[in-house]
């Protein structure tokens, strides 16, 4: 429990932090990696270079400072971050390292005096304990389930298949021959890459792209321009290759009542978590609407698979948008609409009181979808989204 004095001091520093901007977290990361270079094996250095991680941490620090007297308002963010941390196998000792560099950063940038530093130390300690306890719960839950494990487990790539021009699926089975822990449709898998071509260990999270299977996991990865790990997986990971995986995690998952209509919306490789959901809804008691947007037929992943699912399950419906169809893309067969997704095409579904909407794709696409949902009166608590990479609010 934080003292009133600590709460007041931390809240009073919030405007100063906001004014400083991501310069605060840039200084923090530079300091931490200089003194603790081993942490480069944990953090995604690509997100450091493009500034996404600095921005995400800055937003989190400002949110904590502003809501320190209303911690329940942060529970959603805590859950999201705790799941991501569990995929990175974050430990309690690492929270101490981060805390020491955060306090040193505040001191070096602002020289606020010992009272402010003590207040931030107390506030950080409380927040760190919340994360440590929640992450321990996640670790124990994964370990205690059938097929579960804690830490890393070695898997072998047993199948590699291209789903479109840029998206490739990878199926992994455990080397020990055992079963694998179940997951909730929409969650992701942590993959650890150690290769001499990389200066540091590279860790990435990729959405599981199929329904639950007892002995394997499937991820489907888009080759990103300049993407170190995605290109490595496409070009160098072959059937028979071994990788180490962390157990499934993530707070974005299918959680709809059996009688609630479900709408799954995706763009590009954002279909990976929603495809896992679709495959898991074959026995659902209410209509399921699949909406997917992509550039054209060449980039349309899982086209035949989804078409077959829709044809064999009467409660499934599919609408596809191509942004720039090729000359051989057939409207009415390959896709139904061109241009940007217009949710008014399913307005009747979205007007149902208990509808649940799940969407994933580029941030701009998700902002566009969220805007339409709000304009159509869909309550915020009934739509759910996933950002690939550091979280952004849409």
From Swiss-Prot:
Please give the residue ranges the record annotates as the region Reductase: 147-394
State a single Gene Ontology molecular function: oxygen binding
- The positions annotated as site (Involved in heme-bound ligand stabilization and O-O bond activation) read 29
Binding site residues for heme b: 85
Q: State the UniProt keywords alphabetically.
A: Detoxification, FAD, Flavoprotein, Heme, Iron, Metal-binding, NAD, NADP, Oxidoreductase, Oxygen transport, Transport
Q: Which reaction does it catalyse?
A: 2 nitric oxide + NADPH + 2 O2 = 2 nitrate + NADP(+) + H(+); 2 nitric oxide + NADH + 2 O2 = 2 nitrate + NAD(+) + H(+)
The cofactors required by this protein are: heme b; FAD
Q: Where is this site: Influences the redox potential of the prosthetic heme and FAD groups?
A: 84, 386
Residues annotated for FAD binding in this entry: 188, 204-207, 387-390
What EC number(s) does its UniProt record assign? 1.14.12.17
Instruction: Paste the cofactor note.
Output: Binds 1 heme b (iron(II)-protoporphyrin IX) group per subunit.
Q: InterPro entries given for it? A: Cbr1-like_FAD-bd_dom, FAD-bd_FR_type, Flavoprot_Pyr_Nucl_cyt_Rdtase, FNR_nucleotide-bd, Globin, Globin-like_sf, Globin/Proto, Hmp
Q: Where is the Globin domain?
A: 1-136
Q: Where does the FAD-binding FR-type domain start and stop, copy by copy?
A: 150-255
Residues reported in the UniProt entry to bind NADP(+): 268-273
Q: Which GO terms describe its biological process?
A: cellular response to nitrosative stress; nitric oxide catabolic process; response to toxic substance
Active site, UniProt feature: 95, 135
Under which main EC class is this enzyme filed? oxidoreductase
Entry comment, domain topic: Consists of two distinct domains; an N-terminal heme-containing oxygen-binding domain and a C-terminal reductase domain with binding sites for FAD and NAD(P)H.
**What the protein does?**
Is involved in NO detoxification in an aerobic process, termed nitric oxide dioxygenase (NOD) reaction that utilizes O(2) and NAD(P)H to convert NO to nitrate, which protects the bacterium from various noxious nitrogen compounds. Therefore, plays a central role in the inducible response to nitrosative stress.
The family classification in the record reads:
Belongs to the globin family. Two-domain flavohemoproteins subfamily. In the C-terminal section; belongs to the flavoprotein pyridine nucleotide cytochrome reductase family.
Q: What is the protein named?
A: Flavohemoprotein
**Record gene name:** hmp
């Amino acid at each position: 429990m934080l003292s009133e004095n600590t709460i007041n001091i931390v809240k009073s520093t919030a405007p100063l932090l906001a004014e400083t901007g991501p310069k605060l977290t840039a200084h923090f990361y530079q300091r931490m990696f200089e003194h603790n270079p081993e942490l480069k094996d944990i953090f995604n250095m690509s997100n450091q270079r493009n500034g996404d991680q600095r921005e995400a941490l800055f937003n989190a620090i400002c949110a904590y400072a502003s809501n320190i007297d209303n911690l329940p308002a942060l529970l959603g963010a805590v859950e999201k971050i705790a799941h991501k941390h569990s995929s990175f196998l974050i430990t309690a000792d690492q929270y101490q390292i981060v805390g020491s560099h955060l306090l040193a950063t505040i001191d070096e940038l602002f020289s606020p005096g010992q009272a402010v530093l003590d207040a931030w130390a107390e506030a950080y300690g409380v927040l760190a304990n919340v994360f440590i306890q929640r992450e321990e719960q996640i670790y124990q839950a994964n370990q205690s389930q059938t097929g579960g494990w804690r830490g890393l487990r070695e898997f072998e790539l047993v199948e590699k298949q291209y789903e479109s021009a840029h998206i490739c699926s990878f199926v992994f089975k455990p080397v020990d021959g055992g079963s694998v822990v179940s997951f909730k449709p929409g969650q992701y898998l942590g993959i650890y890459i150690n290769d001499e071509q990389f200066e540091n260990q590279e860790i990435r999270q990729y959405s599981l792209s199929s329904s639950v299977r007892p002995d394997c996991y499937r991820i489907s990865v888009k080759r990103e321009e300049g993407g170190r790990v995605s290109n490595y997986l496409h070009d160098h990971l072959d059937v028979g290759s071994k990788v180490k995986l962390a157990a499934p995690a993530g707070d974005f998952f299918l959680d709809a009542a059996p009688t609630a209509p479900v709408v799954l919306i995706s763009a590009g490789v954002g279909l990976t978590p929603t495809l896992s959901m679709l495959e898991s809804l074959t026995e659902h008691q209410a209509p399921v609407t699949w909406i997917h947007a992509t550039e054209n037929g060449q980039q349309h992943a899982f086209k035949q698979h989804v078409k077959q699912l829709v044809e064999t399950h009467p409660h499934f419906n599919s609408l596809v948008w191509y942004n720039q169809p090729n000359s051989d893309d057939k409207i009415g067969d390959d896709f139904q609409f061109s241009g940007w997704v217009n949710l008014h095409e399913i307005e009747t579904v979205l007007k149902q009181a208990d509808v649940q909407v799940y969407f994933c794709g580029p941030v701009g696409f998700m902002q566009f979808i969220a805007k339409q949902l709000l304009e159509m009166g869909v309550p915020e608590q009934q739509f759910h989204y996933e950002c690939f990479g550091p979280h952004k609010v849409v």
